[in-house]
Curated annotation (Swiss-Prot):
This is Pyridoxine 5'-phosphate synthase. It is an enzyme of class 2 (transferase). Disulfide bonds: none annotated. The gene is pdxJ. Gene3D superfamilies: Aldolase class I (3.20.20.70). Catalyzes the complicated ring closure reaction between the two acyclic compounds 1-deoxy-D-xylulose-5-phosphate (DXP) and 3-amino-2-oxopropyl phosphate (1-amino-acetone-3-phosphate or AAP) to form pyridoxine 5'-phosphate (PNP) and inorganic phosphate. NCBIfam families: pdxJ (TIGR00559), PRK05265.1-4 (NF003626).
């Protein structure tokens, strides 16, 4: 079975807008449903300990929505962030909702957004038991990584299913008009991951402007997770048309990749 690269829409920014007024508008569940109506293959959230955007009730509602609509639910987050008032912790959220995919990300509590991947040599011993636990719940496990990451074979041994390439450096170089060299590095990292049996996802600062070039250069990307750019573009173009524009890019660049 094969299919094109999948689009998972990150709805964090919808929650940011809602929380800015302290009421229920815009409705995160309704926005996610509109993305699914437009053809999105999945929904992504990255709940943080300070509940600056996605909250516990959002995760529960989105889990129910994605299961009812037959699309994937991807929960991102730092598994080492301690539970606290209003935040039960990433593992507790995943245990409760059993998402299709859990993407582990090494972000600090005060970071505005994710900006680096895991160091397998340093953080691997702490990750291994968490990966085992998440896999027991029937969830696919993906690790957020930098281009040129080392230790991919170790990650495969730990039971990791996929990596998510942190594409921020590519987006920056693309904006500057000099992305060829970094694209070659991303392509090499993707191939190395695939050679040891890992699937490859990608995300961070991908947009309508740079997505096609990235997918044209980096082989067999299974999923892209896009939030900030997509929601920003949707302010001008509308949410449903914007999602469809991304799907058009996926169709035109990489119509079929083997699923892992």
């Amino acid at each position: 079975m094969s299919q094109r690269t999948r689009l998972s829409v990150n709805v964090n920014k919808i929650a940011v807008l809602r929380n800015s007024r302290g009421d229920g508008a815009p409705d995160v569940i309704r926005a996610a449903s509109a993305c699914i109506d437009a053809g999105a293959h999945g929904i992504t959230v990255h709940p943080r300990p300070d509940a600056r955007h996605i909250r516990h009730d959002d995760v529960i509602g989105l889990s129910a929505l994605t299961r009812a609509r037959g699309v994937e639910f991807n929960i991102e987050g730092n598994p080492f962030a301690e539970p606290r008032a209003g935040y039960c912790g990433l593992l507790a959220l995943c245990r409760e909702t059993r998402p299709h995919q859990v993407t582990l990300v090494p972000d600090g509590d005060q970071q505005i957004t994710s900006d680096h991947g895991f160091d397998f040599a340093r953080e691997g011993p702490g990750l291994r038991p968490l990966i085992d636990e998440i896999k027991q719940w029937g969830c696919r496990v993906s690790l957020f990584v930098d281009v040129n990451v080392t230790g991919l074979a170790d990650a495969a041994i730990w039971g990791v299913d996929r990596i998510e390439l942190y594409t921020g450096p590519y987006a920056e170089m693309h904006h500057a008009g000099c992305s060829d060299a970094v694209l070659r590095e991303f392509a090499t990292t993707a191939r190395l991951a695939q050679d040891v049996g890992l699937g490859v996802n990608a995300g961070h600062d991908l947009s309508q402007t740079n997505l096609g070039v990235f997918l044209g250069a980096v082989p067999d990307v299974l999923e892209v997770s896009i939030g900030h750019a997509l929601i920003s573009e949707a302010l001008y173009e509308g949410l449903v048309p914007t999602v469809r524009r991304y799907l058009d890019i996926l169709d035109s660049v990489n119509p079929a990749v083997s699923m892992r």
